[in-house]
């Protein structure tokens, strides 16, 4: 073999490998920051509670991501209500409904004194609320009565599942109304999503073209006005960020917070986090969501 050719071969091989690595660099940079081992705060939650936490977060401008159990199923609890409002708004966009139309409301829609329906309870004497008012109550206040009445209006849990399928989510499913949708038996796929799938829904509904600009503005406004998120992601996200979120919890072992947040105008970050299982206390759940918020602020801002 010619010595000159022998010397060239390794150099050419190096050049090819270098070009391949450079070409792959954007994809490598977009991989989750902790795909195999969770950060200490998440590991501690799973160890101390016996439950699990799932996270998917992505800066849509830089492509940077954080993920842990991002493709595992978690019970949604009330976080489904943001998608429910999106379905209502899609129907409005198609002329099938109107935000000003009234939905009847009566004492029979509040089954017990401890039933969580703050807006419905305040308005029982009126006998009705508008579609827009019920959407705002369901998303901003997590009102269960308003959510159930809206579900009935759009065709029930199966209709919401069909909406997810039609708009690109092949994972998320709703099988029950409130309060049955909050059950969390291990391994049961009913009423569940994954952090990654729900982040995709937020991207399509809040930032994408599934809804008209005015409908996106309505949905974002209701999420910006979230009244139930102080002890969730908002507990750790930078206070200067714009935060639009929807929470959920079953009062036992499951909770979630899904959000679109903006560190700066025009720089959206998706954050979807869920916990389920084990025996967590309220303080442990609040603490780990705050930890996730801080992590997102430090790594994806």
Identify the function of each model-found stretch.
Residues 46-49, 86-96, 107-109, 139-142, ...:
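Sec/Tat-exported extracytoplasmic proteins
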Residues 3-22, 37-45, 152-153, 157, ...:
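Structured C-terminal helix/loop/strand segments within mature extracytoplasmic catalytic/sensor domains
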Residues 31-72:
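Beta-lactamase-like hydrolase cores
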Residues 52, 127, 148-207:
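Mid-domain, small-residue-enriched loop/turn segments at the edges of structured enzyme/sensor domains
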Residues 110-148, 157:
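Conserved catalytic neighborhood of penicillin-recognizing serine enzymes
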């Amino acid at each position: 073999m010619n010595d000159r050719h022998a010397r060239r071969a390794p150099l050419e091989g190096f050049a090819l490998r270098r070009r391949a690595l450079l070409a792959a660099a954007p994809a490598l940079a977009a991989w989750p920051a902790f795909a195999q081992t969770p950060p200490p705060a998440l590991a501690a939650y799973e160890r101390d509670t016996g439950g699990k936490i799932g996270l998917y977060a992505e800066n849509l401008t830089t492509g940077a991501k954080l993920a842990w159990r991002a493709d595992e199923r978690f019970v949604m609890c009330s976080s489904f209500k943001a998608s429910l409002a999106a379905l209502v708004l899609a129907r409005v966009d198609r002329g099938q409904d109107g935000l000003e139309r009234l939905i009847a409301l009566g004492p029979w829609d509040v089954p017990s004194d401890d039933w969580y329906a703050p807006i419905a309870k305040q308005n029982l004497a009126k006998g009705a609320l508008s579609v827009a008012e019920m959407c705002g109550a369901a998303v901003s206040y997590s009102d269960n009565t308003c959510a159930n009445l809206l579900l009935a209006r759009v065709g029930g849990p199966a209709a919401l599942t069909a909406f997810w399928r039609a708009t690109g989510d092949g994972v998320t499913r709703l099988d029950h109304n409130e309060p049955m949708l909050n059950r969390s038996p291990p391994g049961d796929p009913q009423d569940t999503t994954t952090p990654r799938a729900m982040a995709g829904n937020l991207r399509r509904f809040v930032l994408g073209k599934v809804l008209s600009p005015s409908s996106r503005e309505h949905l974002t406004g209701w999420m910006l006005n979230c009244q139930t998120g102080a002890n969730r992601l908002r507990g750790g996200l930078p206070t200067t960020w714009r935060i639009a979120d929807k929470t959920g919890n079953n009062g036992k072992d499951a909770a979630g917070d899904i959000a679109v947040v903006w560190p700066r105008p025009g720089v959206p970050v998706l954050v979807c986090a869920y916990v389920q299982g084990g025996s967590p206390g309220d303080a442990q759940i609040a603490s780990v969501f705050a930890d996730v918020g801080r992590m997102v602020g430090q790594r994806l801002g």
